[in-house]
Amino acid sequence: MTDIIIIGGGPAGVSAALTAKHRNKTVKIISNSAEQSNLWKAKTVENYPGCPNVSGEELLSAFNKQIEDAGIELITGRALNALPMGETFSVSCGQDYYDCKAIILTVGVTQQSTYSGETEFLGKGVSYCATCDGMLYRGKKVAVIGLNEEAASEAELLRSIGCDVEFFDKNRAKKYEICGNDIVTALVADDTLYPVDGVFILRSTIAPNSFLPSLETKDGQIVVDSTMKTSIKGVFAAGDCTGRPYQIAVAVGQGNLAAISASAYIEGK
């Protein structure tokens, strides 16, 4: 059982991980590859103390080196959801599950909005992971809405296990609606109806309230108190996912505070 799992490996996540480690907590970070980060693409970062005119790539590489030197486990992948298990949580990443006592969300800005019917049919025909749920649709018709780099290969995986796949890349349609009664029966893409048994929505990131459905958000941002606690006991958040200002220094400070709060929560149980 890990003490703290951190979702996101940017400035807030790295700061939280190092702080938690220094407080003798076991830590895992689950994060997309650094290359998918908006910070990685920044040519120059001019306002982070001690690192004048550093590129985003250089800064993230330094963060990852510090994580490695501290012996903190970094799992590259997309965290799909977290299931409350009494006083602990089970976090899924691909086909793997990781148990922990507390979660810190440092997922950055989630720019994608959910589609009509997406939340309603999650687990009832809507999935975020072809590898995890593909076999449930063997011999059936599925739609894949591909919004990340791995989407095309995941669509091919579904075909290889016997699914009839209708693939939508990010340019094929602008508007989607998922339809059904108790389960998914169709996808409407730009007013064209496609009868399907399932819809795989493959994004680089997942909206926080899809990851934890009971999590309180406002305008897509996670609501936290002054100690970075969220509406769910044992879940904390830091960085851009909690709202403006979107600054590296702010994210680092919030990550530090979230780890202090998460550590105190664990110690007080």
What are these regions (language model features)?
Residues 2-58, 140-172:
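Beta1-alpha1 glycine-rich phosphate/pyrophosphate-binding loop at the start
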Residues 16, 39, 84, 114-116, ...:
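Short glycine-/acidic-enriched loop or helix-start segments at secondary-structure transitions
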Residues 120-136, 202-245, 249-250, 257-260, ...:
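FAD-site-proximal beta/loop scaffold in flavoenzymes
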Residues 38, 61, 67-85, 90-92, ...:
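A Rossmann-like FAD-binding core segment of flavoenzymes
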Residues 20-21, 42-45, 117-121, 157-160, ...:
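Short, glycine/charged-enriched secondary-structure capping and boundary segments
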Residues 1-5, 74-140, 189, 200, ...:
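FAD-binding core/adjacent interface of flavoenzyme oxidoreductases
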Residues 13, 110-111, 150-151, 206-207, ...:
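Glycine-rich nucleotide phosphate-binding loop and flanking beta-alpha elements
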